[in-house]
Structure formats: structure tokens, C-alpha cells
From Swiss-Prot:
One of its GO terms (cellular component) is mitochondrion. It comes from the Eukaryota. It comes from Xenopus tropicalis (Western clawed frog). Residues 88-110 are annotated as: Disordered. The gene is fmc1. This is Protein FMC1 homolog.
């Protein structure tokens, strides 16, 4: 299992993802923000008292942060590659970083 890092870093990452999700509305007014803040404050000092395993809540928060980040990246990739309909061969080649060869003029190519 990879190292979890600090709980504060995980908390800030969750808040960042909430800001991305909400866009225009204030993320501090959402129920998700209030719940996350409450859980981090409740388990701030006595983390092992409420958890069966050491750092269980921190692990769950890190896993949820990974999920939110992955969903956001998936949506960005989906918008970039699947939301444009039919594309020309030049556009498709450009998506993967290639260029089509130039067609020479003259007999046989017209």
C-alpha cells in the first residue's frame, strides 16, 4: 500500500475537487463540504479511537479523493475525444500527434 501523506493534504485535495464539481456555486454551502469538514474535525485527534484499523478514515478519504480526481479527468478526456462527432482523417491523425503525408499532384492522384 502506498503512503497516504498528511490528512491536511487530503482534506485540501477534497476541497479542490468540490470546487471543480460545483463551478459557479459556493462549495462551502454544500452538504458534502459540511460533512467532510465535520468528519475531519471529529477524527482529528482521536483517529484510532473511532477506527478499527489505524488511519482507516484517512485511507477512505484518500480513496474518495482519487475517485473524484479520476472522474474529473475522465470527463475531460470524454469531452476532448468523443464530443465532436465525425472528424476528417487529418483531425484524427492530429489527435494522436501524427500528420498525414502530403499527396503529390500529377497523374494517378487526381
Amino acid at each position: 500500500m502506498a503512503a497516504l501523506g498528511s490528512p491536511l493534504r487530503t482534506f485540501h485535495g477534497l476541497l479542490r475537487e468540490l470546487r471543480y464539481m460545483n463551478g459557479v456555486t459556493r462549495y462551502r454551502d454544500t452538504a458534502a463540504y459540511k460533512y467532510i469538514r465535520e468528519q475531519f474535525r471529529r477524527n482529528q485527534v482521536t483517529e484510532e479511537k473511532l477506527c478499527r484499523a489505524q488511519q482507516e478514515l484517512h485511507f477512505q478519504a484518500s480513496t474518495y479523493l482519487c475517485l473524484l480526481h479520476s472522474v474529473r479527468n475522465h470527463d475531460m478526456l470524454h469531452q476532448e475525444y468523443h464530443a465532436k462527432g465525425e472528424r476528417s482523417p487529418e483531425q484524427v491523425a492530429g489527435l494522436v500527434g501524427l500528420k498525414l503525408p502530403k499527396q503529390p499532384g500529377g497523374k494517378g492522384w487526381e
